Structures are given as C-alpha cells and as structure tokens.
C-alpha cells in the first residue's frame, strides 16, 4: 500500500503527464508488486490531511522495537485536484499492483496535450523522531519532457551524516534517459529505456484482421543501466527487456520481462498476466550462470468486491447493443445463422458483464469474438466470403478490437473493490508472504505475515507480523 505522500507524488506525475512506466527502474514494477510486496512489522498508524490543493501533511506513529514516528510535509506548485481521501480512493490507486503499459502512440498524445507540466515543482520533507534523521525530495520540471529529481537523507549514523542523489531525467514517448549522481562512493550512473516499434506502423492490408493479430497494443521496451563508483573504481551493468500486450478478444493484459546482470551472472525472467478483472498471477525464475543456482517464485493477488445489493459488475442495462456492420451483412446473406447468432448473443451478454465504450449516445459496440474465454476462437461472421477485406472492414474490426481492450481496462478501473489478498512464495528460500489490504470504515488497513522454514528444526517461524492503519482527509 502506498503511503499518502507516495500517493500524492503519483497524482503529481499524472497531473503533469509524467509516465512512470517509461523509467528503467520501473521496468519490473509489476512483478515486484506481486512478489516482493512489503509486510507490516508491528503496529503503525498514519494520519494525513491535504490542507489545500497545494499542500499536505502527514503524521506517522509506530511501535516497532520502540515508540517512534515521523512528521512530513508536501508542497506542489500546481493544484492536486485529482486526489482523494482514504474513504473515497479506489484500491487500484492506493495499492501497488498490475500496471498496464500503454503504447507509445498513446503516450505521445498525452505529452502533446500537456499544458501544466512546464516549470511545475514538488517539495517534500520528513522528520523522524526520536533522533534527528531527515529526508527531503525536490522535483522540478525543466521542460515538457525533462525534470530534475533530488533526494537527500540526513542521518548521523551514515557516513558524512548523510547522502544525496541527483537525477536528471528525460522522458519522451519513444525513449527515456537518466543521468544519476550519488555522493555515496561518488557513484555515477546512466540509464536508458527505448520503446521499439510504433502502434501506427502496423499494416494488415493484405491480412484479414479478424484472423490476426490476436494481440495488439503491444509495447516492447529494452533498457540498460551503467554504473561506476569513482572511489572504489567498481563498475555496474544490467540490461532488461519488457514485453507488454493485451488480448484483442478478451482485453486481458500480460507482461513479460527479462533482466540480466552480466557481471554477477544473474538472469531473471518474469511472467505476469491479469487472469480476470479481480485476479492476477505472476511467476519469476532466477538463475545464476556461474553458480547454477536457481529459484522459482510464485505470487497472485485477488480482489474482493464491495458488498452491494446490486451486481458489482457494470452492465448493459441502459445501452442499446448492436453488432458490427460486417456481421449484419453476413447474416443477411445467410439467414440460417441468424437464429444461432441471436441465441448466442443472449447467452453471451448474460455470461460476460463487460462494459464497452459508448458511441452516439447509448449505443455500445460489443465484442465480435464469440467466446471470450478462448482467444483463438474466431467468429465466422466477421470473415469475408471471398477472402478479400475492404478498408472499411479493416477499420471496423480494428475499432472493435480496441473497444474490447478498452472495455476490460475500464472495467478494472471502475470496479468497486473492498479488499485485496496477496500471496507469494519462493521455493528455494522457503518463504511465504501473506498480505491483506482493504478498507475498514474510513481507514485503509494493511496486515500480513511473513513465514520461513527454520533450516535446523524444519518448523515454520514468524519473520514479520504486523498491521497498519492509514487515514487521510
């Protein structure tokens, strides 16, 4: 679960159209949210308030080993009007989970329409007690596509009483670059991330789009980072590949990543798929080419809908549903299929509660694929009888597939969830993590446990156990 200050920072990025998914450090963010999620330790309560649209404060108190806490302040040069308190915020925005990667064409349009991003800034500071530890962060937008990020930590237990990290970031639709400097070990780093291909470059004029492609909105990102510690003369290098796509027949997204560290010989691959609106599955395989050590990690998250009298799923109750024009033309030529078509549509709408985009008032385009559970099942009414496909048919089928993709994403965003259950395990480490996060009255609650197997007695033991309450106005 995000802290309130982290939530405000993400709202600041959304207000200024800064794409976090286009940063190299977030290339494996989806798998980390499902496998490496933190477990609360002890008791913690967080009370926050946004006094104005430009400023907010937060107070945290916990009893881990001893009574301690912190006091934080945040200021934004632009109004953060897209924020909500813990009573009204959706769990999709308050909890780290599956992240849908958008094609570069969508990112380009967002950045092009950006008006408020230039010269915007965000200031954040936190003071811990007891003790004299301080942390601060400054975000300064230099241009529409570049910003300066500074993070500072002041702690008497650190060398020279603290450290500072400076990020100079350039983020465009096609690529992102970062130049990083840290006072710790005089560390210098360079990160790059490139998005291959373009959503507008696909050409299927000679192929029926009802047959292929079965996946669209695909994004292939490749990146690398190079580090050099000037004091110890130690290098660092890693590379990563991310492939994200969404099925055109079901709209379900999936993400695959491959990360390599050639210096230590570590290879890591992940596969994450959103199996339904309320569930996600993730797997991760680690391998070392030098020691031949390997590890398999599995995890999933399962959302629960809020208890309501009506069905939590959006429905077609107030929408006029119609098929695509190409399908109607085919049915007129083959009347024997009309009865089967009508019967199937009735069963289809009762079984799959997916709300699509609206067109011309209350008209709604439905999915032309007959069986949403089978991504390889093609509706024959969409296939041309003579094997040729016109430009109009191409556009209609493309728009329909985009509608199905957008419908699934809208259904995820608009669903009213009350809680989420997360589970992850590692076969080699023999560790099990269980986390429950949800809404209790006007509070957001996070509680979980981390279990491991004692190598001597072979009995389970608790590594972490705690509960956290968060309240924000």
Swiss-Prot record:
The lineage of its organism: Eukaryota, Fungi, Dikarya, Ascomycota, Saccharomycotina. Component of the ER-mitochondria encounter structure (ERMES) or MDM complex, composed of MMM1, MDM10, MDM12 and MDM34. Associates with the mitochondrial outer membrane sorting assembly machinery SAM(core) complex. Keywords: Membrane, Mitochondrion, Mitochondrion outer membrane, Transmembrane, Transmembrane beta strand. Belongs to the MDM10 family. It comes from Candida albicans (strain SC5314 / ATCC MYA-2876). This is Mitochondrial distribution and morphology protein 10. It is a multi-pass membrane protein. GO terms for cellular component: ERMES complex; SAM complex. GO terms for biological process: establishment of mitochondrion localization; mitochondrial genome maintenance; mitochondrial outer membrane translocase complex assembly; mitochondrion-endoplasmic reticulum membrane tethering; phospholipid transport; protein insertion into mitochondrial outer membrane. It is found in: Mitochondrion outer membrane. InterPro entries: Mdm10. Lacks alpha-helical transmembrane segments, suggesting that it resides in the membrane via beta-sheet conformations similar to those predicted for other outer membrane proteins and porin. Component of the ERMES/MDM complex, which serves as a molecular tether to connect the endoplasmic reticulum and mitochondria. Components of this complex are involved in the control of mitochondrial shape and protein biogenesis and may function in phospholipid exchange. MDM10 is involved in the late assembly steps of the general translocase of the mitochondrial outer membrane (TOM complex). Functions in the TOM40-specific route of the assembly of outer membrane beta-barrel proteins, including the association of TOM40 with the receptor TOM22 and small TOM proteins. Pfam families: MDM10.
């Amino acid at each position: 679960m995000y802290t309130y200050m982290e939530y405000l920072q993400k709202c600041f990025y959304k207000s200024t159209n800064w794409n976090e998914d286009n940063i190299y450090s977030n290339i494996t963010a989806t798998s980390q949210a499902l496998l490496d999620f933190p477990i609360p330790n002890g008791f913690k309560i967080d009370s926050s308030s946004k006094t104005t649209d430009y400023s907010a404060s937060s107070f945290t108190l916990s009893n881990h080993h001893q009574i301690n806490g912190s006091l934080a302040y945040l200021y934004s040069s632009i109004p953060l009007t897209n924020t909500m308190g813990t009573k009204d915020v959706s769990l999709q925005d308050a909890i780290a989970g599956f992240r849908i990667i958008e094609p570069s064409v969508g990112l380009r349009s967002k950045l092009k329409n950006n008006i408020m991003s230039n010269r915007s800034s965000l200031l954040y500071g936190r003071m811990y007690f007891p003790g004299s530890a301080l942390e601060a962060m400054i975000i300064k937008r230099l241009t529409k596509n570049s910003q300066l990020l500074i993070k500072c930590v002041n702690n008497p237990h650190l060398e020279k009483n603290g450290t500072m990290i400076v990020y100079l970031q350039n983020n465009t639709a096609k690529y992102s670059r970062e130049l990083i400097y840290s006072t710790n070990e005089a560390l210098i780093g360079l990160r790059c991330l490139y998005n291959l291909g373009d959503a507008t470059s696909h050409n299927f004029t000679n192929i029926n789009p009802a047959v292929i492609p079965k996946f669209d909105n695909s994004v292939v990102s490749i990146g690398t980072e190079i580090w050099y510690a000037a004091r110890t003369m130690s290098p660092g290098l890693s590379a990563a590949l991310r492939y994200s796509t969404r099925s055109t027949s079901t709209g379900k997204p999936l993400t695959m990543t491959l990360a390599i560290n050639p210096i230590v010989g570590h290879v890591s691959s992940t596969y994450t798929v959103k199996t339904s609106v309320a569930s996600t599955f993730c797997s991760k395989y680690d391998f070392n080419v030098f020691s031949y050590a390997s590890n398999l990690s599995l995890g999933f998250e399962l959302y629960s809908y809020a208890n309501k009298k009506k069905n939590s799923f959006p429905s077609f109750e107030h929408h006029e549903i119609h098929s695509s024009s190409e399908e109607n033309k085919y049915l007129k030529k083959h009347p024997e299929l009309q009865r089967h078509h009508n019967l199937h549509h009735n069963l289809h709408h009762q079984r799959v509660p997916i709300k699509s985009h609206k067109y011309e008032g209350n008209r709604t385009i439905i999915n032309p694929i007959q069986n949403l559970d089978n991504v390889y099942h093609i509706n024959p009414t969409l296939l041309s009888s003579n094997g040729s496909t016109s430009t109009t048919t191409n556009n209609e089928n493309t728009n329909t597939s985009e509608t199905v993709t957008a419908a699934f994403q809208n259904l995820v965003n608009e669903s009213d969830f009350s809680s989420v259950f997360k589970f992850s395990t590692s076969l080699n480490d023999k560790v099990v993590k269980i986390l429950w996060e949800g809404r209790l009255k006007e509070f957001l609650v996070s509680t979980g446990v981390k279990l491991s197997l004692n190598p001597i007695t072979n009995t389970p033991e608790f590594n972490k156990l705690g509960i956290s309450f968060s309240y924000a106005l």
